């Protein structure tokens, strides 16, 4: 019996010398190698699953771009347009607008706009009109609508006015403020609004 006890003691001591710690009935191995990282198995599995999921998601997104190129091109071209307007110009719906701080006659205001490769504002929709009224405030601003010698009303870009908004007054040039769109004398001195497409 003594020889059995001796062999167990020798085995136990030789295992303890190699890094084992005896904690009662369970034995826990702790091997420390220089430069190694110890990660428990559940954490290792979680990391592998996350990396795999990320790779699958990236592959799925790239495959979607090739299977539905029209959808991605449409989103990229329409949603990511950044208007480039000069300083002091305001960007709205792919158009640059300039609201003057001085006053001039309609003809001189149109000339000032031309110097910036623009015209007095041409308004195509109710939304554009709401935008101009809001920014004009209480001050009268020239826009690019004029009646040449009692003929048809035309915009500064040459298009005919189709009477889509109510125009009051008896003048031949049109101004706008936050409430009204009015035909007034072209020689009056008002602020003005220039417009041109954004780049």
Swiss-Prot record:
Extracellular domain ranges by topology: 62-199
GO BP of this protein: cellular response to xenobiotic stimulus; negative regulation of T cell migration; negative regulation of T-helper 17 cell lineage commitment
Membrane association type: Single-pass type II membrane protein
GO MF, any single term: identical protein binding
Transcription recorded as keyword: no
Record's keyword terms, sorted: Cell membrane, Disulfide bond, Glycoprotein, Lectin, Membrane, Phosphoprotein, Receptor, Signal-anchor, Transmembrane, Transmembrane helix
Record-annotated C-type lectin domain positions: 92-195
Compositional bias annotation for Polar residues: 1-14
Modification comment: Constitutive Ser/Thr phosphorylation in both mature thymocytes and activated T-lymphocytes.
Location of region: Disordered: 1-20
PROSITE patterns: C_TYPE_LECTIN_2
Disulfide links within the chain: 85-96, 113-194, 173-186
Segments in the Cytoplasmic topological domain: 1-40
Transmembrane intervals: 41-61
Assembly with partners or alone: Homodimer; disulfide-linked. Interacts with S100A8 and S100A9. Interacts with galactin-1/LGALS1. Interacts with S1PR1; this interaction mediates S1PR1 degradation. Interacts with JAK3 and STAT5.
Listed name of the protein: Early activation antigen CD69
């Amino acid at each position: 019996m003594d020889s059995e006890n001796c062999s167990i003691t020798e085995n136990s001591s030789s295992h303890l010398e190699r890094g084992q710690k005896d904690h009662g009935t369970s034995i826990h191995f702790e091997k420390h190698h220089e430069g190694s990282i110890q990660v428990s198995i559940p954490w290792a599995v979680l990391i592998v699953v996350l990396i795999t999921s990320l790779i699958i998601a990236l592959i799925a997104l790239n495959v979607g771009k090739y299977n539905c190129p029209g959808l991605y091109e449409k989103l990229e071209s329409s949603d990511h347009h950044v208007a480039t307007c000069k300083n002091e110009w305001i960007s709205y719906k792919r158009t640059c607008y300039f609201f003057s701080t001085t006053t001039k006659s309609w003809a001189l205001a149109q000339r000032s706009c031309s110097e910036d490769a623009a015209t007095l504002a041409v308004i195509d929709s109710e939304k554009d009109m709401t935008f101009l009224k809001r920014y004009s405030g209480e001050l009268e601003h020239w826009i690019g609508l004029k009646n040449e010698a009692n003929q048809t009303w035309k915009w500064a870009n040459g298009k005919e006015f189709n009477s889509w908004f109510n125009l009051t007054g008896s003048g031949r040039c049109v101004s706008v403020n936050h409430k009204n769109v009015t035909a007034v004398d072209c020689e009056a001195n008002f602020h003005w609004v220039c417009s041109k497409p954004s780049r």
